[in-house]
Amino acid sequence: MNAEFQGRDILLQQLSKAKIIYKQEYAFISIKFKIEGDIEPYPYHVRVPVEMRAFQQSSAPIIFLLHIVNGIIDELEIITADSAEINTDNIEVERVEYEINQEVIVKNNS
């Protein structure tokens, strides 16, 4: 996670203790996380704290949505903006854009 937002380090800790359940269908990929062991819950009541769009040269952007449920990292949902089939072998991540939920934006105190 290259984007900076409040609680990011908590989610990274949760990811380090997660088992991954991968599911792919035509136009989406679901990466579910099952957390094992004790973890610090994400303290913000935001379902999707960060979204990433990866712009592709020959197709619509691919959108990555990180879902949090009850303070626990739950799923990384990956979809195409035009509902086309996702080719996991050719996802380009050279040009990405992040959208941070307003509730968890890191505010500068300058």
Summary of predicted features, one role per range:
Residues 1-47, 88-110:
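N-terminal domain-onset segments
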